[in-house]
Amino acid sequence: MKYVKSIFAALLFTVVLSIGAFAQSAPKVIAVVNQADWCSVCKGNGQRALGAFMENNKDGEISLVVNDVTDAETKKKSAFELQKLGIIKAMKNYEATGVIYFFDAKTKKPITQITVANSDEEIAYVISKVKRAVR
């Protein structure tokens, strides 16, 4: 059952990434969520937080990338995506799991961060604040 849930979660994240890629070719903000299969905060809050993120990012201004740090293999796959976006160096300072880190897409500088354990309202507030910061 855990394997099925992991497959489902991976599929959901892939769909979210694909939607973000088609919604806007040049996002103003890159959001990176560090997650791992062993992270209890991620397991308990990840799907709810992802739903809150999607609900508040219908315009696609923020591109979401999942940085899966479960093991060496998932880290390698995630590193490829981070490298494509030019934020792999910036992410070296942000390694905590269960956290969404927001970066300016042009400068690659950090804007803010929030844990996936925060409420939907707090996540919505941070997303609106981030969008205003890059306008």
What are these regions (language model features)?
Residues 1-6:
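Positively charged n-region of N-terminal signal peptides that target proteins for export
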Residues 9-18:
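Bacterial N-terminal signal peptides
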Residues 19-23:
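Sec/Tat signal peptide C-region and signal peptidase I cleavage site
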Residues 26-28, 47-66:
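Conserved helix-turn-beta segment immediately C-terminal to the redox Cys motif
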Residues 34-48:
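Conserved redox-active cysteine motifs that mediate thiol-disulfide chemistry
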Residues 59-79:
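Thiol-based oxidoreductase modules, predominantly thioredoxin-like and allied folds used
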Residues 78-106:
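Short, internal strand/loop/helix patches
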Residues 95-135:
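Non-catalytic, surface beta->alpha helical segment in thiol-disulfide oxidoreductase systems
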